């Protein structure tokens, strides 16, 4: 982690490194009934362990580079609105993101007072897995605003959290209210049923 952070600092060309955004995710289909050890471990490594270790790396960095003000350094874990709105699809992915979401407050307590830790849980922004464009166009409106989520607003929210020192140990949904629209399946599968009926085949996985 320290070498990666040093490389990031060098890439910034002299600008101070103050925030790590953990956005990488593994997203493979399975259910609780079909999950295998290899898939569970792979999702855990990418979606949970690596973000937490990078946060610990920023702690060591912050302790070596005095900040101009309290709360200056921060770690942002990019989650998923699904952690607030569960369904049984993409089980290994969901479990790994739930673990990371539960870790936000714990890591914030452990890294204080040097580093703040927050989560951001966006909704559907891009084509997901085997999703078709028609399916996405409909699924992206399954939220309280009935409108697609603008990725630029998610990015702006990350900047806001990084610059607001009073925010710590919390998770901010940025999803047009998608987490308040419960579904029994992943939104892609729910829309597929709407388009083609209850007997429709799911998109190939």
Stretches with model-predicted labels:
Residues 101, 111-125, 167-174:
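Conserved Rossmann-fold SDR core element
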Residues 135-153:
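Catalytic Tyr-x(3-8)-Lys segment
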């Amino acid at each position: 982690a320290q070498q990666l952070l040093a490389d990031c600092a060098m890439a910034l060309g002299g600008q101070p490194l103050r925030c790590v955004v953990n956005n990488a995710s593994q997203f493979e289909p399975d259910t609780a009934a079909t999950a295998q050890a290899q898939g569970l471990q792979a999702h855990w490594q990418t979606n949970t362990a690596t973000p937490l270790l990078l946060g610990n790396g920023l702690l060591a960095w912050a302790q070596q580079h005095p900040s101009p003000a309290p709360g200056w350094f921060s770690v942002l874990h990019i989650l998923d609105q699904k952690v607030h709105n569960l369904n049984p699809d993409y089980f290994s992915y969901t479990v790994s993101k739930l673990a990371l979401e539960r870790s936000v407050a714990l890591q914030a307590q452990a890294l204080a007072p040097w580093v703040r830790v927050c989560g951001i849980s966006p909704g559907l922004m891009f084509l997901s897995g085997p999703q078709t464009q028609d399916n996405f166009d409909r699924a992206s409106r399954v939220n309280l605003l009935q409108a697609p989520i603008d990725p630029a607003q998610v990015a702006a929210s990350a900047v806001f959290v990084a610059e607001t020192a009073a925010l710590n140990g919390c998770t901010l949904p940025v999803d047009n209210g998608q987490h308040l629209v419960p579904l029994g399946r992943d939104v892609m599968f729910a829309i597929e049923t709407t388009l083609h009926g209850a007997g429709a085949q799911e998109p190939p996985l």
